[in-house]
Swiss-Prot record:
Monomer. Its EC number is 1.5.5.1. The lineage of its organism: Eukaryota, Metazoa, Chordata, Craniata, Vertebrata. Residues 109-130, 428-447 dip into the membrane without crossing it. GO terms for cellular component: membrane; mitochondrial inner membrane; mitochondrion. It catalyses: a ubiquinone + reduced [electron-transfer flavoprotein] = a ubiquinol + oxidized [electron-transfer flavoprotein] + H(+). Keywords: 4Fe-4S, Acetylation, Electron transport, FAD, Flavoprotein, Iron, Iron-sulfur, Membrane, Metal-binding, Mitochondrion, Mitochondrion inner membrane, Oxidoreductase, Phosphoprotein, Transit peptide, Transport, Ubiquinone. GO terms for biological process: electron transport chain; response to oxidative stress. Residues 577-606 form the 4Fe-4S ferredoxin-type domain. This is Electron transfer flavoprotein-ubiquinone oxidoreductase, mitochondrial. It comes from Sus scrofa. It holds the Pfam family Fer4_ETF_QO. GO terms for molecular function: 4 iron, 4 sulfur cluster binding; electron transfer activity; electron-transferring-flavoprotein dehydrogenase activity; flavin adenine dinucleotide binding; iron-sulfur cluster binding; metal ion binding; oxidoreductase activity; ubiquinone binding. Binds 1 [4Fe-4S] cluster.
Amino acid sequence: MMVPLAKLASPAYQCFHALKIKKNYLPLCATRWSSTCKVPRITTHYTIYPRDQDKRWEGVNMERFAEEADVVIVGAGPAGLSAATRLKQLAAQHEKDLRVCLVEKAAHIGAHTLSGACLDPRAFEELFPDWKEKGAPLNTPVTEDRFGILTEKYRIPVPILPGLPMNNHGNYVVRLGHLVSWMGEQAEALGVEVYPGYAAAEILFHEDGSVKGIATNDVGIQKDGAPKTTFERGLELHAKVTIFAEGCHGHLAKQLYKKFDLRANCEPQTYGIGLKELWVIDEKKWKPGRVDHTVGWPLDRHTYGGSFLYHLNEGEPLLALGFVVGLDYQNPYLSPFREFQRWKHHPSIKPTLEGGKRIAYGARALNEGGFQSIPKLTFPGGLLIGCSPGFMNVPKIKGTHTAMKSGTLAAESIFNQLTSENLQSKTIGLHVTEYEDNLKNSWVWKELYSVRNIRPSCHGILGVYGGMIYTGIFYWIFRGMEPWTLKHKGSDSDQLKPAKDCTPIEYPKPDGQISFDLLSSVALSGTNHEHDQPAHLTLKDDSVPVNRNLSIYDGPEQRFCPAGVYEFVPLEQGDGFRLQINAQNCVHCKTCDIKDPSQNINWVVPEGGGGPAYNGM
């Protein structure tokens, strides 16, 4: 059945139906020590317990409406909006009628966007050459660029030489959420149909196996998996080409990697978790345009990570500060959130924050694999852009510019194929192979290739400091043209050591002025989900968190989650523990899906509009 998409913009259509997977049978044990207790059902999502095997769903109308478009884009971040904008720019230039639909799971554009962010404006200026006249929110050019190594008590300054990737001359400090909101306005003005509050949950396929489009998930489902009286089926969006711009570790991209074997010829992706706060500080300490990065304390040399402090010129003395920890860390006792809070007490950091007020908090995973981890980008009916495949320049600590350029190149490649008079396709869904070729011939590919060895050079005996030495010698001499390519260590989920082989980390208690507890931090993210819905953090096997993760790794999920989603709590009866999932706290960072040593957690989309409500993060 076909209906205008705009008529479906109601809460009943604000989430997506996830792909079904094999039913997992309930295991027999739920305690750390006892094997006599039955496992409580922790997650009830219909991806685990299919509805066609649930009598409560008998007689429920499962018909879905469908809409047709030329191009469907999943995700309204910098990459997705760049692709949408460029498609409509080209359509206007060539007087072509092109329907472009963009869906975004956040309640409004920018609400799930989090980055530092120090923006290299190259791709942005290519897409919007008149951005100044249009009032784009690039208000803070970099005026001072600093880098340092932290010891427990001191900061050792390191000069930033011209030509090194961390040089920020010509860049802008931005609030990326505000920037993508502005980009959304530009896209809509060109005729892009932007639908916030719609979460893509299912990939649709043609009979020949090519991608047909996506479907939004159903709404009106109880926490126990039963339909509510308000149940409404999701919506299908069909397209000639579907662009997946979900951001880092997209849940649909995970399925595409397996379906089309897109990672057959690349290394596993490796990630970091970025935690960020926004402060209003004493105006006397405010240095608009100052950019400050550090490595070192409180992390040891074998744990990749670092920090940033960006002074924003937004009409008030704003400071964006954050901390990144590589998710290939080995100690299961490590808590990225608590390392962040401890870092703020360093003698070179704390004075800037004293007398200030924290006004926002958030977290998001980021790609760190770089050139070696880029998968195949195209497949019949679709392609990957932005942080979904992973185009972040790690030593530069930037990925927005490369994400935007990938979106622009994808749009140009798709437009050429859609408007070709000799259009030929072996599959029903168009296979736009030109996109990958164009990307490899662009400055994006050259930039990522040149820095490919810097992140993996930190795996040696000297750790992060070895990586700095490598950068200072080999990158300075060869400019990325050295005749070798270093490898990563493998998947981040395989890197944890057993708890018995590691030293517990004692973290200081937060003081409530500089450092804070987790729950008060999550409250500043604006995170909210419909409570009575199946948990979107699903478990393949309900026994694994206690029987394996807790017994071997001391329950690392209770530490690597930056939102307090996972807790091991005592059983109501008997000895032992059970895992409690506080799904309503989830900030959609994807860390659990990445770092879980058992790969038992599968993140799927909740009802559309749920999640964090960032304001210019």
